[in-house]
């Protein structure tokens, strides 16, 4: 049974895992503004997201990457109820996404270079 969330937001947490159980998050991107199921605008930090929700989402994303001993850049995606701020896991994209420059701009971290260093 699936839950219907009438005012849903699509929020992603950028993670980077080192392959040995260590992982970090590089903040979130709100990609709720979409047209024909394609992202139009990515915003970071996600506007109006309470700090405690932001922290719990980041903790959940990092825990997933750590538990899997994930190596490299990945994006953990969530649906967030805009009224209650309850969030639900959608999927993890195990690659660098086209939106990675948004994260690079706010963190100053070159994700492609970091991936290459991990691989080398």
Language-model region placement:
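ATP-dependent carboxylate activation and anion-phosphoryl transfer catalytic cores
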Residues: 2-120
